[in-house]
Amino acid sequence: KQAGALLLSLAIIGGTVFPAGQIRAAAETKQPENSMKAATVSDAEKIPGTTVPGLLSRRPETMGKKRSSGGEVYVSASSSNARWDSGAGTEEDPYISLAYAVDQAEDGATICLMSDLTETKSARFWDKDLTIDGQGHTVFRGDGFEKAQDLARGGYHPAMIEVGGTRPGEAQTASLTLTDIVLDDGGKTEGVNFKQASTDGKGGNESLVQDAIVATYNGTAEIILASGATLRNFGGMSAVRLSGGDLVMEDGSQICDDTNGVADRTKEKGDYGAAGAVWIQGGSFRMEAGAEISHMRGRAVYLDGGSAEIGGSISDIRSDKDMWQGGAGAAVHVRNEGTAVLSQSGSIKGIAGESTEHTVIDTVIGDFEAVSGSEISGCRDIMVASANDQGKDYVHKMLLNGLISDCTTKGSLMRSWYAEITVGPTGQVSGCTATGAGGLLYTNNGSRYVFGGKITGNTAPKGIVYLANQSGGRVSARMLEGAEISNNKGLGIKVNNGSLLTMEGGKISGNTGAGVEVKGKTDKKGAAFIMNGGEISGNGSYGISYSNAGESVVELNGGTVFGNGSRAQISVTGGNSNDKNEFIHIKPGTLAGNREIYLSAGTMTLDEDYQEVWLG
């Protein structure tokens, strides 16, 4: 009865008691129920000095022994001790088990490895700050890794190391620092299903693979991967699981698969799939310059709420349909109000696509910013960026102020769906190729682009920017002062299917096709181009190519159109218009130099001092 009352009034994650209702919804994903009952907890299973149930299913028999004194604790597989919970933790008489060492170590201690270790028991601790100095050694996940148990999850497969505090809502009370060490999962899985464990106390989690190599669950701990720390070959859902709390990857730290092969984390039918190397559900992740996530199949960062600042390098990742959310965001996937920033020192390079529909960066109800100085380059057969704001309210943004270069795809380089993508004033997209039907930068249903930077030297036969509303809200794009869409192979901007392009400034020049193509359609009305400033010049075809159908409109209120390659600067096709909402409007001075306009009925040339012109 007491256990039942406890489960009704409290929720417990990672050995920590939370007031009911304060656990993030993302951590409460329900799984199919089974007959497993919540475990009872004896006094021996409680964290010392508290009444709080812990994650350990059985505390060491040596609980009452004097713990190792001093600031260093030693562990060696070559110890003469036979029992996992024996030894004094000294250089002369080291512990044999990392799990026992972290339990026995005092707050502030450094655990020093004297040899490689193969562990079959999770090393878990609470309310302590511990450093594990591998001294160049590796800790391997052994076969038959023991299950753990708590009231929230019942029996489950744990991470190699779990850290947390017992006082949620307070300042962080625990930390783990890893230095000069390799933790190697060996691509092994305990359990078979790639799903998030349920935390409703009903169990049913023993078939699920482990969450991570290293994990924290309740917002009270910090994990620091210091120089020389490597997490390798994660076999479960992630290498690091962060449900609240903080993760820092310092210069010289790494998460990767080894050179002997890249693990293929294949999910069963109905599974979510693995999350990624770093799996964040709340809390914060800071990846410093010199840190690296590389050489793996799947995903680098899965940000399900919380924040990530990426100042290190993400490279050599191949997307995989078997990941959670499939191939969306092989480098960074942001959702559930998460915010990710690729900082000045951050780079994403060499991401490859299993499918051209897969993406390097993907946001779903979340924000992403690449700041000036950041770089995304060398990506192959994959879309670089996709933004999806499912609330259709444009609250979430994708701001690109860094460099995107040398990326190729048979699809489009970017895409949005009810979202806004901004190429900021320092943003550059250059040297990229997209041969798909949607051009280089594609937008769909209710989406927006804002161009303030430079899009130069790219190749896209269907257009550098392709605006099209296929079945939803109106698509729009704005071009600002200082923006450039220039010297590309292909037309500059295609305005299709009722879309709107507004040019406030900037330059569309030197492209091999037309500067702007406005394609009116009777079944998808309202395509419009409004030019209030800037210039359209030096393009290989018409400055403006306009098909007057379906209440399409071109208004040249300011700026100039001049020096384009075709004999006429403007082409108007589609025959005579009998609709007052279908026209081209040219104000004085907006058409300069050669002032020819090609019409279905013939060619006309405006006088040098022409007055306002309306055609339609």
Task: Locate each region found by the language model.
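Solvent-exposed loop/turn tips at the surfaces of repeat/solenoid architectures
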Residues: 130, 135, 178-181, 186-187, ...
